[in-house]
């Protein structure tokens, strides 16, 4: 499975739940010579921001939102992604890496119940 396919599955699930969320531009960049990428980066887009940002507090307000970095197969978070995850976790958000739709659903349930 490709990361974009995983993201599409998760977006479909999130739309069904009615949660407030958005996806970042992580996968749109095509190379260093791409003029669109250079223009976006000149507008202060940050490398490493998680793929899915969910703007829903956990049930007892332990967390203000859930930020999910998607990885498939043997892929691992980059240095910048790890830094963003650490910064978000230090600021009352829950940021986590996810590798499958099944894992995502488990994460959502644990997030809502504040068991993660």
Enumerate the predicted regions with their spans.
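Catalytic phosphate/metal-binding cores of nucleic-acid and nucleotide-processing enzymes, i.e., regions
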Residues: 1-116
């Amino acid at each position: 499975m490709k990361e974009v396919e995983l993201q599409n599955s998760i977006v479909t699930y999130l739309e069904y739940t009615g949660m407030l969320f958005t996806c970042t531009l992580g996968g749109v960049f095509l190379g260093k010579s791409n003029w669109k990428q250079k223009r976006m980066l000149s507008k202060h887009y940050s490398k490493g921001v998680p793929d899915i940002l969910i703007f829903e507090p956990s049930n007892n307000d332990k967390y203000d939102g859930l930020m999910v970095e998607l990885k498939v197969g043997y892929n691992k978070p980059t240095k910048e992604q790890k830094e963003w995850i650490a910064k978000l976790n230090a600021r009352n958000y829950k940021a986590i890496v996810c590798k499958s739709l099944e894992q995502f659903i488990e994460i959502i349930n644990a997030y809502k119940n504040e068991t993660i």
